[in-house]
């Protein structure tokens, strides 16, 4: 028996759960379902990250479900602080009123980069700007619409390739990627593109 199998059999290899899960209280997928049941026509944005290596670069992806519109923010690091800081320019681009209308809910996964729920939910003056909910563990189907767009991103930036060697090195390149994706006609938009 190999040493690895022996260690597993003897219980040496244990998965360590993240200790602090307080950010999930009131923000689980079950809470998301309850919230959307109680609030008709709520605008939902799905959020995730796409990357090929732990050294980056990283793409923080946002999908506006009402419009099938995707937006990418370029990052050099994948930290909770970086993810929170990217919501500010999104709010700035849309303007406060439009942001409050179109980004009522952000649905994301439980990645450590999204663990600062309060930072994502509140703007710089501490007022609520959105509600964050987390998909169940290992349930990418809970944000399947965005995952489908990730397939389009992977067509441009295949897995296991160095993104910087491909030329993905700036927000300008991220904008070019989403320009291509948002220009494609979508069946759910009756043959129109998200930009139309």
Task: Spell out what each predicted region is.
Residues 2-59:
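Mobile-element integrase/transposase regions
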Residues 42-43, 119, 123:
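Active-site microenvironment for binding and transforming phosphate-containing groups
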Residues 48, 62, 68, 87, ...:
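Mobile genetic element proteins and their domesticated derivatives, centered on retroelements
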Residues 48, 99-116, 136-138:
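Acidic/histidine-rich, metal-coordinating catalytic segments
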Residues 52-55, 72-97:
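Active-site beta-loop-alpha junctions of metal-dependent nucleic acid enzymes
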Residues 55-57, 65-70:
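Coil-to-beta-strand transition motifs
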Residues 67-71, 97-104, 159-160:
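Short, surface-exposed connector motifs at secondary-structure boundaries
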Residues 122-125, 129-196:
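Charged alpha-helix within mobile-element recombinases
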């Amino acid at each position: 028996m190999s040493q690895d199998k022996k260690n597993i059999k003897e219980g040496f290899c244990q998965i360590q759960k993240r200790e602090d899960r307080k950010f999930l209280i009131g923000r689980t997928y079950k809470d998301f379902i309850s919230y959307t049941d109680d609030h008709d026509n709520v605008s939902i944005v799905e959020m995730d990250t796409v990357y090929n290596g732990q050294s980056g670069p990283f793409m923080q992806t946002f999908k506006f479900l009402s419009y099938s519109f995707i937006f990418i923010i370029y990052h050099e690091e994948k930290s909770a602080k970086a993810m929170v800081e990217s919501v500010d320019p999104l709010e700035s681009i849309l303007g406060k009123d439009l942001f409050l209308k179109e980004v009522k809910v952000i649905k994301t996964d439980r990645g450590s980069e999204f663990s600062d729920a309060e930072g994502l939910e509140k703007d710089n003056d501490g007022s609520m700007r959105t509600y964050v909910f987390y998909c169940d563990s290992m349930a990418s189907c809970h944000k399947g619409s965005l995952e489908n767009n990730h397939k389009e991103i992977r067509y441009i930036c295949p897995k296991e390739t160095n993104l910087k060697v491909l030329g993905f090195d700036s927000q300008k390149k991220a904008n070019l990627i989403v320009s291509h994706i948002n220009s494609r006609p979508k069946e759910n938009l009756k043959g129109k593109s998200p930009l139309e």
